[in-house]
Amino acid sequence: AALARACPSWNDDLWLVDSTPVECGRSRETVKRSDLAGWATYGYCASHSRFFWGLRLHLITTPSGLPVAYALAGAKTDERDTALDMISLNPELHRPGQTLMADKGYRRASFETELTDAGITLIRPTLGKEKPRPHQQFLRPFRQIIESVNQTLKAQLDLERHGGRTKPGVCARILQRLLALTAAIWHNETSDRPGSARSLTTYDH
């Protein structure tokens, strides 16, 4: 958290929220014997059109990709409840005037009401017969950012091959990835490197 706060983008007034699968095992025997049973559960990954056994990493980031809050939860845990918990349980995120950008999975009247009460404006896609919501033109580029952050964690930081077999082990290994991403963003932002702040190309050796 201290390193994230040292990044210039920490104070950005726009947040992006999303979750991504963290698989913890594939074989039936692993599921039966794993110390993660009860925390890890079966869930569905829409982007890969398949079920998985494991957790979901919930992230709130800035547009630069800087993680400002995270949570590891069971694969079926409600994304909206988790997002509210991440914000309400972290005093540093009590920032009236923030804007939170989310996908259609975060649609729920009570979710938006709680955000509004906290002074946070929700931007999400217009669904069905809803009255057109504002700022729809910004959704696509910012959705690409959060998806790019998830891809960085998976492709370059091996999130899906974390190798954790116990709760402390999984938490430590996921935190390693988030810390590595945060450190790269801090270095890129404070050294004025050209290009994306979340780029890890310089550190690929």
What kind of feature is each model-predicted range?
Residues 1-205:
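Short alpha-helical elements
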